[in-house]
């Protein structure tokens, strides 16, 4: 068997509708589009969200919230990401290892994943669950 000899089982695939190919095909003349009107024309359909001139729902509803610029400077680090780092882990070590973006000003370790080895954190914020996991693995946190 070769890829070029594989074919679907007979009758399992319907043949494509060939529209506008004569009266005998059943899809000639208007080709299933009906008579006149916007949807009978080439390119004749409205853009997504258009409601026929009525103010669209997206514009009727107010804008909500904002994106904090502070969040761009604070990064979260998962527990399993610490396993690949050696020595004392501080913000500079996290940036150097590309665990957090270079413009990060603060980092916080969150309890996600597993930590098998002992690590020492310095000057990095830690959640309660992450603190327990680090200490359970034999690590320590220096403020």
Curated annotation (Swiss-Prot):
Q: Does the keyword rRNA-binding apply?
A: yes
Give the organism the record lists.
Answer: Thioalkalivibrio sulfidiphilus (strain HL-EbGR7)
Q: Which residues cross the membrane?
A: none
Q: Which Gene Ontology terms of cellular component type are present?
A: cytosolic large ribosomal subunit
Gene Ontology biological-process entries: translation
Biased composition of type Gly residues is found at 21-31
What SUPFAM superfamilies does the entry give?
Answer: Ribosomal proteins L15p and L18e (SSF52080)
- Any idea what job this protein has? Binds to the 23S rRNA.
Region Disordered: start and end of each range?
A: 1-51
Q: Which Pfam families match?
A: Ribosomal_L27A
Keyword annotations: Ribonucleoprotein, Ribosomal protein, RNA-binding, rRNA-binding
Q: How does it assemble?
A: Part of the 50S ribosomal subunit.
Task: Give the encoding gene's name.
Answer: rplO
- Superkingdom of the source? Bacteria
**MF (Gene Ontology):** rRNA binding; structural constituent of ribosome
Similarity comment: Belongs to the universal ribosomal protein uL15 family.
The protein depicted here goes by the name: Large ribosomal subunit protein uL15
Coiled-coil annotated spans: none
Q: Does the keyword DNA repair apply?
A: no
| Alphabetical list of HAMAP family matching this protein | Ribosomal_uL15
User: Do you know which NCBIfam families this protein is assigned to?
Assistant: rplO_bact (TIGR01071)
């Amino acid at each position: 068997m070769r890829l070029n000899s594989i074919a679907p089982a007979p009758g399992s695939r319907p043949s494509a509708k060939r529209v506008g190919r004569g009266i005998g095909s059943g899809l000639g003349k208007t080709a299933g589009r009906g008579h006149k009107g916007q949807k009978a024309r080439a390119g004749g359909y409205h853009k997504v969200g258009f409601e026929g001139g009525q103010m669209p729902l997206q514009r009727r509803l107010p804008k909500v919230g904002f994106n904090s610029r502070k969040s761009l400077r604070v990064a979260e680090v998962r527990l399993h990401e610490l396993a690949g780092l050696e020595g004392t882990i501080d913000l500079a070590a996290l940036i150097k290892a590309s665990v957090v973006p270079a413009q990060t000003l603060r980092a916080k370790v969150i309890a996600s994943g597993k930590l098998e080895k002992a690590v020492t954190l310095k000057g990095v914020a830690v959640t309660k669950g992450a603190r327990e996991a680090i200490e359970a693995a034999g690590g320590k946190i220096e403020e």
